[in-house]
Regions:
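Long, charge-rich, low-complexity alpha-helical segments
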Residues: 1-145
Length: 145
């Protein structure tokens, strides 16, 4: 049967996708619902902690029971999105306000960016990347806070 995959090919493809973190095993509905509130509370704590520099860089999925590794800026973008901000420019502005409140700035090529315009430009670029790449994973894994 040309064009059909056998079990070994399917298993190999799934193994590869899982190894690349492009696929995840999911829990049954009862387990997902049981874990949802605890995951939400943990994720809220992590995103709040990221405001102050945080030490935990993972959000937990109730769907898979697994963690999604994220840097501080991505955690702050996720927090802004999960709080209802829908546009990358809003996330960038939100993160910039947080960084400013701590006297921090973005780094680019190992150098601190000077001024609001340069920092917002970099944050907007990163927010667009987050929207194109990471946000899909957050939604698919039902990560919320």
């Amino acid at each position: 049967d040309r064009g059909k995959l056998n079990e070994v090919q399917i298993f190999s493809a799934l193994t590869l996708l899982h190894a690349k973190n492009d696929a995840a095993l999911v829990q049954d509905e009862a387990s997902v619902e049981s874990a949802r509130a605890r995951c939400r509370a943990f994720n809220r704590m992590v995103t709040e902690s990221a405001r102050h520099n945080g030490e935990i860089y993972y959000l937990i999925s109730p769907l898979s029971g697994s963690a999604l590794n994220m840097g501080r800026i991505d955690l702050l973008f996720a927090a802004a999105y999960l709080q209802g901000q829908q546009q990358p420019a809003q996330w960038a502005e939100s993160v910039w306000r947080i960084l400013q409140s701590y006297g921090q700035a973005m780094l680019k090529d190992g150098e601190a960016l000077q001024g609001e315009e340069a920092n917002l430009a970099e944050l907007n670029r990163l927010a667009e990347e987050f929207a194109a790449n990471r946000l899909t994973a957050l939604k698919a894994l039902q990560i919320e806070n």
